[in-house]
Amino acid sequence: MASDLRRVTFNYPGSVSGPVAVIGSFNQWNPLAHPLRRIDMEWRIEVFLPPGTYPYAFLIDGQVGRDPSGHVLYGPLGGRYSVLTVAD
């Protein structure tokens, strides 16, 4: 249900030229699903997600990078991802 969704804001700081997108388990790691918009000196997007824990990363100009302000999860193949927990 839509009432079970929580608003989540993803921010990527800095003056990278872009494009920047957020990829994660909530969008099947699809780089086209959630592109961020540049607002002032950061990139930003708001999405609505159900409660849960989600590994995610940023795709910055085609390169995968983790959220510099997020918690780190180490994947089974050695990759590093950020972790988002959406509370009930």
Where are these regions (language model features)?
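Aromatic-rich carbohydrate-binding modules that target alpha-glucans
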Residues: 2-53, 61-88
